[in-house]
Amino acid sequence: MSTAPVTLALMKEILGRVAVGASLSETQAEEVFEIIMSGDATPAQIGGLLLGLRVRGETVEEITGAARIMRAKALKIEAPPGSVDIVGTGGDEAGTFNISTAASFVVAACGVPVAKHGNRAVSSKSGASDVLTALGVNIDADFALVHETLWENKVGFLMAPRHHNAMRHVAGPRGELGTRTIFNLLGPLSNPAGTTRQVVGVFAERWVEPLARVLGRLGAEHAWVVHGTDGLDELTTTGPTRVAEYKGGEVRLFSVTPEEVGLKRAAPADLKGGDSATNAAAMKALLKGEQGAYRDIVVLNAAAALVVAGKVDTLGDGARAAEQAIDRGEAEAVLHRMIAITNRTS
C-alpha cells in the first residue's frame, strides 16, 4: 500500500498547526523533517513550513527533532574519542578572517582531535572550504584520507554537502525564500562525526541559550554556544561574548572578555578578512607566530574548545596552551601534514 496518502495527511496536519502559530512537538518535528529529507514533500510544502517556523520562531523541540533527522540522514565518519567541533552558523555578515578554521589547527596541535564541519562562504568572501583550498588542502579528498588526517593528524575537514546529500531536497525552496530558516541553525548541530563536545557560534544572541539546550537534548557532553556582542558568531576580542555552557545536564549563562585571559581588546576592523587567498596568507603568518588581532581571536576560540574538550580547566589555561602550540610551530605542522595527507592517493 502506498504511503503517499499518509504522508499527505501528516503534512497537512503539521502545516495546519504551523499556520495558526502552534508549536510542534519533538516527535512531530522528526516526522515532518523525515518526510522532507526523504524527498517526499513538495517545494510548496517545504517553503510553507520553513517560512511558518521562521515567522513564529523555531522552538527547542522543533530544532532538536529536525537535527535528529539531519544526523540520521548524514553520511557518517568515525572520529577519535573526545573529538571537538568549532563551528558557526554563519550569517553574521561580519566578513571576518577564518577564525574557527585557524583555531582548529591550534586545538589539534594541543592534542585534541577536531572534526571540523564546514562549507563554502555564506556571508563572507571566504568560508572554511574556500580558505582550506587556498592553503592547499584537498577538501574533496577520499574519505579514507579524511579519516586518516582526523585520526593521525588530529584534524579533519568534513565538507557539509558531501555528508548531507538529503539537503538537496530543500535547496530549491531555501534559495527561493531568500531568508534565514531553521536550516541555518541545523548545520552546526549536524556534525557527521557525531561530536559531543562543541563550540558553536550563533548569528544572534537570542539563540545562545536555546541552542545549548538543543545540544543537551542531542546528547552533548560539554558545549559552549557563543555570540559576540559585536555580532560575531565566534568568541570575540572586541568586547564581551555571551556564552551558554551545557554540561552535566545544566545550562549556565555567563560572559567572557579578552582581557580576563590576558588578550588585547581589538577594534572590529582589525578582524576583517578578505578573499580566500588573502585569508590563507594571513593564516600562514599567524601559524608562523605573527602577533596581532588575528592571533588573539584565534587563541581565544581555541581556548574555548580546549575547555569543552576537558584538556584544560579554565579559559586562561586554554589561551596559554594555544599560544604555546603556535609559538612552538606545532599548529603550523598540523596544517602541513593535513595538506600532505589530503593530496595523497589513498
Curated annotation (Swiss-Prot):
Its cofactor is Mg(2+). GO terms for molecular function: anthranilate phosphoribosyltransferase activity; magnesium ion binding. SUPFAM superfamilies: Nucleoside phosphorylase/phosphoribosyltransferase catalytic domain (SSF52418), Nucleoside phosphorylase/phosphoribosyltransferase N-terminal domain (SSF47648). Binds 2 magnesium ions per monomer. Its EC number is 2.4.2.18. It catalyses: N-(5-phospho-beta-D-ribosyl)anthranilate + diphosphate = 5-phospho-alpha-D-ribose 1-diphosphate + anthranilate. Pathway: Amino-acid biosynthesis; L-tryptophan biosynthesis; L-tryptophan from chorismate: step 2/5. Anthranilate 1 binds at G88, N119. It comes from the Bacteria. Mg(2+) 2 binds at D233, E234. Keywords: Amino-acid biosynthesis, Aromatic amino acid biosynthesis, Glycosyltransferase, Magnesium, Metal-binding, Transferase, Tryptophan biosynthesis. Mg(2+) 1 binds at S100, E234. Belongs to the anthranilate phosphoribosyltransferase family. Catalyzes the transfer of the phosphoribosyl group of 5-phosphorylribose-1-pyrophosphate (PRPP) to anthranilate to yield N-(5'-phosphoribosyl)-anthranilate (PRA). HAMAP family: TrpD (MF_00211). This is Anthranilate phosphoribosyltransferase.
